[in-house]
């Protein structure tokens, strides 16, 4: 299982140094881009993707929490994103089908409050799934769902051993072993890596 470091929780005034200082704790970088509409917060700029691509050698996992996704997927891919996740709550199935036709490595995310059954229709077009386990937009929040219960719900809907499963939100050091045992491929950590 890989660890993806959520840079939203890092020191924004000295980001590259904070990444370097904690480099032994993660495998890739997770970049949350929010718009103040899908979430109650405005997050990182799209430019951070190109800056991190130029200044680090990490795989960049970009998590878009936006009302409008298509033009921003195109931009973050141009800027160097290796994987992009959009949300089923703001991306209908036709838009998502077009995204996966035009771009590689586009995944689908789901909020902790949404019915997991929604993912069935998206599974035809992607094998990358992100289970958000906190309410979106802010770092260092408590979990909104039980991680293992949510994973089991996911497995009951998407039965694909080739899937890449990402769990994002409130993941502690103690959660890592159970997540790996339950088939999670990528665990996103913010506060657990960079501190609170």
Residue map of PLM features:
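Short, aromatic/basic amphipathic alpha-helical patches
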Residues: 98-100, 181
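Alpha/beta catalytic cores of nucleotide-metabolism and tRNA/nucleoside-modifying enzymes
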Residues: 156, 160-167, 172-196
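Conserved N-terminal beta1-alpha1 strand-loop-helix module at the mouth
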Residues: 1-85, 91-94, 98, 106, ...
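Internal catalytic-core helix/loop-beta-alpha segment
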Residues: 105-113, 130
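Generic beta-sheet signal
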Residues: 6, 63, 109, 132, ...
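Glycine-rich phosphate-binding active-site loops on the catalytic face of alpha/beta enzymes
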Residues: 84-92, 130-140, 182-196
């Amino acid at each position: 299982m890989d660890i993806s470091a959520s840079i939203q929780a890092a020191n924004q005034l000295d980001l590259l140094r904070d990444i370097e200082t904690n480099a032994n704790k993660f495998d890739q970088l997770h970049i949350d881009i929010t718009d103040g509409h899908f979430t109650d917060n405005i997050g990182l700029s799209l430019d951070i993707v190109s800056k991190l691509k130029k200044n680090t050698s990490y795989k960049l996992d970009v998590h878009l929490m936006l009302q409008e996704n298509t033009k921003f997927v195109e931009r973050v891919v141009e800027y160097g994103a290796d994987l992009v996740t959009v949300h089923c709550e703001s991306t209908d199935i036709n838009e998502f089908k077009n995204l996966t036709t035009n771009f590689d490595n586009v995944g689908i995310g789901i909020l902790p409050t949404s019915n997991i059954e929604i993912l069935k229709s998206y599974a035809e077009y992607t094998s990358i799934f992100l289970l958000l386990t906190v309410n979106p937009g802010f770092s260092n929040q408590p979990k909104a769902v039980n991680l293992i219960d949510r994973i089991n719900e996911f497995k009951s809907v998407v039965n694909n051993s080739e899937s890449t499963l990402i769990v994002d939100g409130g993941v502690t050091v103690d959660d890592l072993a159970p997540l790996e045992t339950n088939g999670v491929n990528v665990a996103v950590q913010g506060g657990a890596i960079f501190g609170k």
